[in-house]
Amino acid sequence: MAEINHLIPHFLHFEAGVPVDDLTRPLEEQFATARRRGWSDDPDDPGGKTMIGVTLDTYRTYCRRKGYPVPTPQRLRDMTFATWRDILKTLYWDRMGADGIHSQGIANICVDWLWASGPGMTKRIQRILGVKADGIVGPKTLAAINAADPTDLFTRLYNARVSYYKGCKAWWKYSKGWMRRLDAIKPDGSFTIYGERIVPRTQ
């Protein structure tokens, strides 16, 4: 089964510029590096204030779901690895039912799409699979994922993401970064960054 910790180094590199040489270090150490690099408030980015890929709106959604106080931008900047990882798991990994996906590569490309483009991407994924596009990943969606040939499904998901990105207004500005991130994800669950194959550790 897919494992969430295998995906984390990919996120820390592309959201916060953690160097390739550091991506096989313990995850807590990678996150410490990411915290020093991961703050963004780009006026062209509709996400606004963002810490290691987590927008303030996303953090508010997470805190509301958990019953936590309404977060401030400073709390967003100060979030711990445990909180950041739980946001990834609660709002994206679990939304995709990724603990039930057999292929790490398929889990990676799906969850990364939800993270990058919003939870609504579950419906696009379901359309690719030919199941009811209700945005709820249940037993039928997971069965379709796991019954598909992983290489073929990965290719279809990859092509769908490229098509989606080309339709985004910000394609002109972010296309190179978006494609570099997508191209790093490999069907076997590894990542290739600057020509180097990365096999993530699990802790």
What spans do the regions from the language model cover?
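Cell-wall polysaccharide-cleaving catalytic domain and substrate-binding groove, primarily
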Residues: 1-203
